[in-house]
């Protein structure tokens, strides 16, 4: 006995007869990796404040994986693009408006990455100046400074230190993928300035490069890297224990 293939006379006839239930329908989420930088007050008054490279995490109050921390995210609506969903999540979680740097990072699709069902995550990376944020406090979200060396990730804030095991799903992998992407782009693009205040010293900027790259930079090499990216202002910053420094801004 042979199966006879039905011949349709039009696209609309085919679509009307199409049975989507014949195939599995995995869910798709958008998870947004939000990076920023901030100051940590120096313990030694002779030293400049330390720059921190940070990520925003949300505490999970419900199952699955209750008690862990995850990146801001959610399911993509049926009428949304992945990018639209990422912007929606970014606005809802941070209150950020205006021109925010956001790029698609990677699609995470391990079959067992979510215990509920088959879920793909289209992850995006956002770079934000914290001064532009107007966080509403409706979720238990906190900034954690990033320590990433030799493939090992630790996250710190004033109350907690998180290991990879404290992060929900595969979000440790998403964070590490984002760090590697940023490391690969920081020296030949100007995306670092999306996390910086409008004015900064060269010392502050060098610290940001170093904490993202995970290595020290020779001052002369650093200045070559940023030579065409910044311009001096006519302002100075004074601080206890060190000489006033010229403030720079991004070269437009």
In which residue ranges do the predicted regions lie?
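Entry/capping segment at the start of metal-dependent catalytic domains
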Residues: 2-17
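N-terminal strand-loop-strand
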Residues: 13, 17, 21-70
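Short proline/glycine-enriched turn/loop segments at secondary-structure junctions
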Residues: 20-22, 112, 235-240
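Conserved Nudix-box catalytic region and its N-terminal flanking loop in Nudix hydrolases
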Residues: 48-97, 184-207, 211
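Active-site segment of metal-dependent pyrophosphate-handling enzymes
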Residues: 50-54, 83-87, 91-152, 159, ...
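A conserved mid-domain beta-alpha-beta active-site/ligand-binding segment of alpha/beta enzyme cores
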Residues: 173, 177-178, 182-183, 187
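Charge-enriched amphipathic alpha-helical scaffolds
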Residues: 215-234
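Long, intrinsically disordered, low-complexity Ser/Thr/Pro-rich regulatory/activation regions
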Residues: 230-252
